[in-house]
Amino acid sequence: EQGVGGDDGL
């Protein structure tokens, strides 16, 4: 899953 700070891998 894409987060604000980058890709969290989920």
From Swiss-Prot:
Optimum temperature is 60 degrees Celsius. There is only a slight decrease in activity at 75 degrees Celsius and a sharp decrease in activity at 90 degrees Celsius. Binds 2 copper ions per subunit. One of its GO terms (molecular function) is catechol oxidase activity. Its EC number is 1.10.3.1. Optimum pH is 4.5. Active from pH 3.0 to 8.0. The activity decreases sharply above pH 7.5. Glycosylated. It catalyses: 2 catechol + O2 = 2 1,2-benzoquinone + 2 H2O. Expressed in the rhizome. Not detected in leaves. It comes from the Eukaryota. Keywords: Copper, Metal-binding, Oxidoreductase. Its cofactor is Cu(2+). Belongs to the tyrosinase family. Homodimer. Catalyzes the oxidation of mono- and o-diphenols to o-diquinones. This is Polyphenol oxidase.
